[in-house]
Amino acid sequence: MSRWSTALQLTDIDDFITPSQICIKPVQIDKARSKTGAKIKIKGDSCFEESESGNLKLNKVDISLQDCLACSGCITSAEEVLITQQSQEELLKILQENSKNKASEDWDNVRTIVITLATQPLLSLAHRYQIGVEDAARHLNGYFRSLGADYVLSTKVADDIALLECRQEFVDRYRENENLTMLSSSCPGWVCYAEKTHGNFILPYVSTTRSPQQIMGVLVKQILADKINVPASRIYHVTVMPCYDKKLEASREDFFSKANNSRDVDCVITSVEVEQLLSEAQRPLSQYDLFDLDWPWSNVRPEFMVWAHEKTQSGGYAEHIFKFAAKHIFNEDLTTELEFKQLKNRDFREIILKQNGKTVLKFAIANGFRNIQNLVQKLKREKLSNYHFVEVMACPSGCINGGAQIRPTTGQHVRELTRKLEELYHNLPRSEPENSLTKHIYNDFLDGFQTDKSYEMLHTRYHDVVSDLSISLNINW
């Protein structure tokens, strides 16, 4: 399977949300209105031709990430648009500038560089370089420190907090019978699709809990900034993620702090981009020094820095929330690993809890755009009301098979690679989100659990993106 395509692929075998090369953002052309009319043609060489006035060369289209988020023309991110702030080149540029400022003792312009590593890229890199997952994290710390990074963190604490917030949000909705079916929100490709394609119909059902990436952004730019006494605007926060759509998520205006004049996440690079950086350095990951990941949140470090959450590889939302709801709503303590029933395909599964012969909880996992489209259509036909929660991920097999994970290099089929990564994930230690470390974060920095401050910092909102029918859908830049 190729990593890139010129259009969104929606076939049974290959329905990744791959970045699109087709963008419909129009060029504004200033011209006086003709009284008699004229024929207009945009030619292949970018010339704008009007029969009465000759040719006018069009300027190159400059498209920002904000344009992508506000545009209703395509479903998700664009590959060839001018994304200058979300690339490994930009990261290297910032690191080099920072090193020069340190060398010249220009302390006013020195930034604190923080790198956050998600679990799925660590699995991908560990498999690529044939090393352990924890060692992959430690070697990456060595690599980024060699470039000038100050802190290299894992997303563990943010993953834990996301589950705590999402499970409580579900229980509150269930008890109030409000906006069910609840749909997970950690996948930016799915959220972008929901905003642009279904808008206000679907958005009330989407969980308001921020994704682990954006929770990590809050922790770094507010809590870590306070702990190390550095203004948030002087921290450059980079995340390593398994999909390109995380770049769009980081660029949402909702995640820009006017008070701090900075984004929660400044730059997102992906697994495949890290591989490219290592390839350009002509040095495999295993040859970099081993450094333990940093843990600035408390004096007590966790035993491991890379953890699994339940059985599923996309954060464990469906399984964890199902267990929590069963216990706290129906007093059912489900201690064994849950088994989801496969429906039409391996990427659509469900699980049911019954009491006295009655279904009281019904959850599902829907991965891949084929299943997402079916899911939304069922909801529109009011046939989905018996699902209480659905974990939704845009990529088949979920985040472990994200569109920016390292692809097979030896003729290996993508599904075989996914199976190998799943094995690595299942061998990781399991994290229980409600632990002393997350309690410390809530009590010391968020005024406790379910407070106004915790809601403000850990939740977000979504926006109906209205289609502009004046834009032609057949303009390819």
UniProtKB/Swiss-Prot annotation:
Which GO biological-process labels does this protein carry?
A: iron-sulfur cluster assembly
Q: Which GO terms describe its molecular function?
A: 4 iron, 4 sulfur cluster binding; metal ion binding
This protein's source sits in the domain of life called Eukaryota
Amino-acid biosynthesis in keyword set: no
Binding sites annotated in the UniProt record for [4Fe-4S] cluster 2: C187, C243, C395, C399
> What is this protein's function?
Component of the cytosolic iron-sulfur (Fe/S) protein assembly machinery. Required for maturation of extramitochondrial Fe/S proteins.
| Protein's UniProt name | Probable cytosolic Fe-S cluster assembly factor GM20417
Q: Which organism is it from?
A: Drosophila sechellia (Fruit fly)
